[in-house]
Amino acid sequence: MAKNTQTQALKILPLGGLHEIGKNTCVFEYDDEILLLDAGLAFPTDDMHGVNVVLPDMTYLRENREKIKGMVVTHGHEDHIGGIAYHLKQFDIPIIYGPRLAMALLRDKLEEAGMLERTNLQTVSPREMVRLGKSFVVEFIRNTHSIADSYCLAIHTPLGVVMHSGDFKIDHTPIDGEFFDLQKVAEYGEKGVLCLLSDSTNAEVPGITPSEASVIPNLDRVFSQAEGRLMVTTFASSVHRVNIILSLAQKHQRKVAVVGRSMLNVIAHARKLGYIKCPDNLFVPLKAARNLPDQQQLILTTGSQGEPLAAMTRISNGEHPQIKIRQGDTVVFSANPIPGNTIAVVNTIDRLMMQGANVIYGKHQGIHVSGHASQEEHKMLLALTRPKFFVPVHGEHRMLVKHSQMAQAQGIPSENIVIVNNGDVIELTGDRIRVAGQVPSGIELVDQAGIVHESTMAERQQMAEDGLVTVAAALSKTGTLLAYPEVHCRGVVMTIQPKLLEELIVRTIENFLTERWSEFTHGSNGSTEVSWNALQKELESSLQRLIKRELQSSPMVLLMLQTDTPIELDQVPQNVSTVSATSATPAPRKKVVLTKTPEPKVKAKPEKKVVTTAEPSAQPVSTTKVYRRSRKRSTTSVSS
């Protein structure tokens, strides 16, 4: 029996890229079939300690993996394809269609991650149509952007055509001679576009975004004026910009040494596919370039965004093994900082200048243009497509608002425009658009080991802000201390004497054992069993309260227990170890008496060891110690 398309709805679920820059990921769902459009990443902020990349929460796709029919990719930027290798570890994507350059870059990523066998990569040509499942047919329409081989998409669904602009600007003098296919866009507008989802990045900017070709005379001037070594940094994926730089190097008779893995990779693929045309002898290894006269050298490198491990950042820090800044060097930043990177870029520029480099940077130099459309280009796309419904995407909140205002000015009724959040479920019928619900929409953080969960990030942040206090205590099966506890503080601002803090900690442990030991013991058949895990958690909480009260801060508290009681392996908590009864001398349980004198007096214990932040770690009481981060709960805006 045929399904009634008048009552069915098309669902559109943006999982990333809204009210932010990066993580562009969108899901289209109809009749139990899912089409995925792009799957990008973002880069971590300064407070995401140890994190390499940020991904959208893909819980919805993990839970509906059997519905996924495939993916379409608009272009090869990291914020559109950078997450795919990570996601393939969690769910299969049967087939991925995309431009030649994007697929070449993606293939490298998947091979490196060992994920190439989890999907099938297929390249497309302009105006090519592909079918995914029974519900979706997608046509690829060439647009213009800062990377070669970029597309907008016409997604045919049972309810009508939904157009997605991809990242775009309307460049009338493109470097590669490939124009935005506005004719095809207009044809869809004539036939009728149900909904348009459009890039909002530069929706605040009046006028028209300058052509990529406009940077050529300004960069040419810089090349002409540079008397010594010339170093240029830009986005590795800005193929058109890289092509301009290489052409100018050839014109000014400079040999090019390419530094940075991503830059080398993109240039290799772009040359193979014909997007960059230059002779082989233009390039020299970095070691060979150092033997050339300064005026014949051009070092093309990554690091335009101040990335910590990128080549230009390492050069500015004096950490690059082969490149040291010297007086007379000219360094060109042919890129503007993306949101969140401004401080890192400014610091990199400052360090380069301090070492004597002449640094060329900033919008006033005319050496960079955006790859995103400004207001007049947005108006043109709206006029050509004439969509019934409109959803601004790919941008921060103010950009989305400005874009929606332009759409209203172009004649789209306000009730036909929705500004949505990541995770919102847009429900689209032939005559209505609405937000019908929400799916998980947080973020997933990835470090070198894998996914970083919320609790781990909270612990890292806590240690970064307030430091770490570790307490090691050895207990007997009767609840007495086998030895005087060890206390170590790292990164903690001490508002009281370390010795006094140690004595307070010891007294808290002794009081706890005296007053509450019986809560964690129970007997059977004449033997006594101890709930070590529960005891550890409660004692650790008591120490946390004490330290917070005394230090007026909240360092992470890590309690490590040792016991002389044999314990079954499945009963041993991660931070409890067993010790031989002979490995430590039992210490008599004694109260530590604190007085109001400047130096508290306590009965001397021969085995006592006092450890402060200035001392190296003391030898442990026993030969076995297990260290573990505590699982203290902490509120955080990061979701797993």
Swiss-Prot record:
**Binding residue positions for substrate:** 368-372
Keyword flag Metal-binding: yes
The record's subcellular location field reads: Cytoplasm
Q: Where is this region: Disordered?
A: 578-640
* GO CC aspect terms: cytoplasm
Q: What Pfam families is this protein classified in?
A: Lactamase_B, RMMBL, RNase_J_b_CASP, RNase_J_C
Listed GO biological process terms: rRNA processing
Provide the alphabetized UniProt keywords.
Answer: Cytoplasm, Endonuclease, Exonuclease, Hydrolase, Metal-binding, Nuclease, RNA-binding, rRNA processing, Zinc
- Which PANTHER family does this chain map to? RIBONUCLEASE J (PTHR43694:SF1)
Task performed by this protein: An RNase that has 5'-3' exonuclease and possibly endoonuclease activity. Involved in maturation of rRNA and in some organisms also mRNA maturation and/or decay.
Q: How does it assemble?
A: Homodimer, may be a subunit of the RNA degradosome.
What is the protein's name according to its record?
A: Ribonuclease J
- Species this protein is from: Synechocystis sp. (strain ATCC 27184 / PCC 6803 / Kazusa)
Gene label: rnj
